[in-house]
Amino acid sequence: MAFHILPTFERGNEKGAVIGRVKHRRENPLEYEIKVVKKGSVKVFVGNKGVFVIEDDLAKEIIKALWEKYVRETYGRRKPKTNKEIVEHPIEVRESFLINFFKEKGFITSFKSCMYLIEGTSSDESTIKDLILLTKKIKEKVTKTT
């Protein structure tokens, strides 16, 4: 299983990362195609409040939720920046959105270690142990660099 640590950025007090892209026709943003960053690898988001481990199917659900929220709230109100027929948008996810999304989905969170372990479709015990070890290593690296 390959892991990909998502490059993060800071906006205010919150961290974010690009988790994928949405491709759609200019006239119909609700008919879209989702492209996940580093397809086939487990994405690791290192935030201020925890480490999030996200597999492809879950990443697609997150992108879908973010895109549909964007279309409802913002899309029609702004003038298009391009005249291309097919438009691609990067999808940025913020830590607060992830926390709320996972709470709504009923995922288990561990506040003792300040980490969120998100189990995907694989519940293999060795896979889960590998993910726990990875999140501990990432937390140690983040602690050393800050």
UniProtKB/Swiss-Prot annotation:
Entry keyword set: Plasmid
Q: Which domain of life is it from?
A: Bacteria
What is the protein name stated in its UniProt record? Uncharacterized protein aq_aa37
Q: What is the organism of origin for this protein?
A: Aquifex aeolicus (strain VF5)
